[in-house]
């Protein structure tokens, strides 16, 4: 059975676990006398073999407040690990990433609260998530979560960060707890039609998102609030087709040969000079993508597709147009002959005539008809960056080929 084969690949061995435990021993020594716990998928037993990142939470009394975490707590942690290979990262508040033997350990300051619904910062709920999941999943259930995670990674819908807008690890765990197994999650998802409500607990307020899973440890929160409709739909379609014809392609998609370029494709390569948090950068990239698309359409271009990918240093925006060539002039459609606005139309336009349909028309010159210039002008990054832009002629870049192909390898 395919799922058993996948598990052999993704389930960590005892050696894998020992390797991470050795790294954690180093961290434990550095955090001695602090109130800390290992959290996340490693602690819950739902981690994948290829994932070598571990979460360690350092807890402080809730009375010290959020500002204390951002300054005092962070400095305390840095002083304890400053001789190790570490970098600062940013979410709701800063945290530290330590790299030891190719294992990434996220050391996150948090506040110790009585229950998940009393969380002051988002990370304060984490230990309650851990307790909930470990009390509701047996060993087989953990393997079912692993299968679901790998499936979602394979089809590109895993990861709650803004860049992806997909399913979090916690969401996959709750789905398996609710439905009972990987296959049962897929059977349900294949029939989804939004809005979808999955209630392990009764919500404490109304939610408007397309997929609603109230957090069992804090029912005021929707666990899947960040999941985009596109990713919900992709997961549903993939579930349907996997159940029809199970394949390793869903878990480990293959690379395809070069695709034919249809239309004109503009590639914008951005190299960022400054570091910032991933969510901040990708919030600006998504706004840029929307602004570019809107500006191109307003200028008369027919946009087939526009996508962005990359990390926090190097980003690619690909714009696919029916054609990069549009006329310098265009037909401007005016009001009907009996409209009170015809005087205004006549004053503002030249080359005016009355059409066979009784409507006034004119010829107008486009303000902008260079698609490349329009796209570059509508990038709204707030950090310094260099940009290289070109019209695609050919490529061996796998991500660009994926953009050209459109159809996921698991679908066809």
From Swiss-Prot:
Changing residue 129 to V: Loss of CMP incorporation but no loss of AMP incorporation. Its EC number is 2.7.7.72. Optimum temperature is 70 degrees Celsius. Inactive at 37 degrees Celsius. Optimum pH is about 9. Active from pH 7 to 10. CTP binds at residues 41, 44, 129, 149, 158. One of its GO terms (molecular function) is magnesium ion binding. Keywords: ATP-binding, Magnesium, Metal-binding, Nucleotide-binding, Nucleotidyltransferase, RNA repair, RNA-binding, Transferase, tRNA processing. It is an enzyme of class 2 (transferase). One of its GO terms (biological process) is RNA repair. Mg(2+) binds at residues 53, 55, 106. ATP binds at residues 41, 44, 129, 149, 158. Homodimer. Forms a tetramer upon binding two tRNAs. However, tRNA-induced tetramer formation is not required for CCA addition. HAMAP family: CCA_arch. This is CCA-adding enzyme. It comes from Saccharolobus shibatae (strain ATCC 51178 / DSM 5389 / JCM 8931 / NBRC 15437 / B12) (Sulfolobus shibatae). The lineage of its organism: Archaea, Thermoproteota, Thermoprotei, Sulfolobales, Sulfolobaceae.
